């Protein structure tokens, strides 16, 4: 939802913005502005990692596994996947051209270089940034920006030694970015220490929502609010990792 809303906002401001799905099609309650084809299709990258002979399967068959409809069906329970079972795959993806998904790295980078030729590329997290070294080599003029958001929740569930190795690799990739965007100073500083990043290079961009749909909303019930009272709106999942309970307590 956030990625789709961000792409919409950039387009409204006149930016030539492409929202490119990785792993699975974009899932959103609103109209999607994402491109229809998927790179690093979730089924393909899993089979490339777990079944060595799969790399010899003809490309046209692999593309069938990247069809949005099939991916949406095959990954409908992806949110319940235990990170503890994905240690090898995580490290392989972070290894980029040295990983088991090297052919997917080559395919994505060639598409960016030959067809898109972007001025800037925004990674919505560093867990998908294994392609950065290849992009740096093939598109040296492109600015690379990554958002740190939620990476810690996934890393926390990786068992040792996968967690430490993944953190080290993510730190290396982050240091190759032109900028790292964070939604809060505290989170940014915490992740900078964890990943070995320079906190001075972090750019703060607080989370927001599009209020346009609510501007004409009239509540059914009006409540008296004492002068000077502060009201806080919370628009997110109610989950421990969001920290709402800390605010309430």
Predicted feature locations:
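Membrane-proximal helix-turn-helix segments that form the acceptor-binding/catalytic region
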Residues: 109-113, 117, 162-180
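Conserved donor-binding/catalytic core segment of Leloir-type glycosyltransferases
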Residues: 223-242, 248
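A conserved catalytic-core segment of Leloir-type glycosyltransferases
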Residues: 19-110
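Acidic anion/phosphate-binding donor-loop and adjacent secondary structure
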Residues: 156-158, 193, 209-228
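Active-site proximal beta-strand in glycosyltransferases
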Residues: 120-122, 135-154
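Short His-centered aromatic/hydrophobic patch
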Residues: 124-128
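Carbohydrate-associated surface elements
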Residues: 186, 208
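Active-site helix-initiating loop/hinge in glycosyltransferases
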Residues: 1, 190, 242-249
């Amino acid at each position: 939802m956030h990625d789709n809303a961000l792409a919409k906002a950039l387009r409204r401001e006149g930016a030539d913005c492409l929202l490119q799905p990785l792993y699975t099609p974009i899932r959103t309650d609103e109209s999607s502005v994402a491109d229809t084809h998927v790179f690093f299709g979730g089924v393909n990258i899993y089979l490339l990692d777990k079944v060595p002979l799969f790399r010899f399967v003809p490309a046209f068959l692999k593309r069938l596994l990247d069809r949005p409809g099939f991916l949406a069906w095959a990954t409908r329970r992806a949110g319940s996947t235990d990170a503890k079972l994905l240690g090898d795959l995580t490290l392989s993806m972070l290894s980029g051209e040295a990983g088991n998904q090297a052919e997917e790295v080559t395919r994505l980078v060639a598409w960016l270089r030959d067809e898109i030729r972007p001025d800037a590329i925004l990674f919505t997290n560093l867990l998908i940034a294994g392609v950065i070294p290849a992009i740096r080599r093939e598109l040296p003029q492109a600015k690379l920006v990554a958002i740190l958001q939620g990476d810690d929740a996934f890393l926390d569930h990786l068992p040792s030694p996968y967690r430490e190795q993944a953190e080290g690799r993510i730190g290396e990739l982050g240091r190759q970015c032109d900028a790292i965007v964070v939604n809060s100073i505290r989170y940014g500083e915490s992740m900078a220490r964890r990943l070995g990043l320079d906190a001075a290079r972090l750019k703060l961009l607080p989370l927001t929502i599009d209020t346009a749909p609510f501007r004409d909303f009239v509540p059914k019930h009006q409540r008296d609010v004492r002068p000077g009272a502060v009201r806080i709106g919370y628009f997110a999942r109610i989950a421990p990792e969001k920290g709402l309970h800390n605010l309430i307590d």
